[in-house]
Amino acid sequence: MTLIAVIDYDMGNLHSACKGLETVGAVPKITDSPLDLEKADAIVLPGVGSFDPAVRQIRSRHLEKPIKAAIANGKPFLGICLGLQILFETSEEGQEAGLGIIPGTVRRFRSEPGITIPHMGWNQLDFTQPDHALWQGLPPHPHVYFVHSYYVDPLDSHLTAATVTHGSQTVTAAIARDRLVAVQFHPEKSSTNGLKILANFVQQVQKLALVS
């Protein structure tokens, strides 16, 4: 049984993420308990909404330290959408300090002719870490589902695992560092490709459990 703690911090509906994880064979547990994060085999941090309320909710529930400890200790971690953005230090969207786990900032798309903001709908990924386990078994340029006006800009470009292009702007769509992965798109809303990404994440968790 692969137990995955899905962090509840009142930032979006967690049902879709849980359903996706269940579909690929994991046992998700929605929780805001630091003890549950410690006991789980892996952690998923989803989220929809704005940067400042999100980090305030994380801190008011005393989840910042447990999240940082889990990542530092090598527990597999998947951030989704807002759950990617709040890992960064700052955001152009708000005033609060982010969790600061990934050096860098969150920036807003520039307005330009022919594009809409938010970037919403299906778009192609371009892999910059093509051999990463998260992408195993996917086509070279898979379509996934996005809804966002802001994107992450890591100081270390080597952390970028995939990019997406909106108009003339090519931005980070996923990051990977050790056992931390986080994506701007919604795998749970990305049909077959999204389920494959979730399955790859769960498979890596299971492999780790076998050797530990």
From Swiss-Prot:
Pathway the protein contributes to: Amino-acid biosynthesis; L-histidine biosynthesis; L-histidine from 5-phospho-alpha-D-ribose 1-diphosphate: step 5/9
EC number of this enzyme: 4.3.2.10, 3.5.1.2
Stretches assigned to the Glutamine amidotransferase type-1 domain: 3-211
GO MF annotations, alphabetized: glutaminase activity; imidazoleglycerol-phosphate synthase activity; lyase activity
Protein name per UniProt: Imidazole glycerol phosphate synthase subunit HisH
Pfam families the UniProt entry points to: GATase
Transmembrane segments: none
Protein purpose: IGPS catalyzes the conversion of PRFAR and glutamine to IGP, AICAR and glutamate. The HisH subunit catalyzes the hydrolysis of glutamine to glutamate and ammonia as part of the synthesis of IGP and AICAR. The resulting ammonia molecule is channeled to the active site of HisF.
CDD domains linked to this entry: GATase1_IGP_Synthase (cd01748)
Catalytic activity: 5-[(5-phospho-1-deoxy-D-ribulos-1-ylimino)methylamino]-1-(5-phospho-beta-D-ribosyl)imidazole-4-carboxamide + L-glutamine = D-erythro-1-(imidazol-4-yl)glycerol 3-phosphate + 5-amino-1-(5-phospho-beta-D-ribosyl)imidazole-4-carboxamide + L-glutamate + H(+); L-glutamine + H2O = L-glutamate + NH4(+)
Alphabetized UniProt keyword annotations: Amino-acid biosynthesis, Cytoplasm, Glutamine amidotransferase, Histidine biosynthesis, Hydrolase, Lyase
Complexes and interactors: Heterodimer of HisH and HisF.
Subcellular location: Cytoplasm
Annotated GO biological process: L-histidine biosynthetic process
Domain of life: Bacteria
Cross-referenced PANTHER family: IMIDAZOLE GLYCEROL PHOSPHATE SYNTHASE SUBUNIT HISH
Keyword Hydrolase: yes
Active site: C81, H186, E188
GO cellular component: cytoplasm
Coiled-coil region(s): none
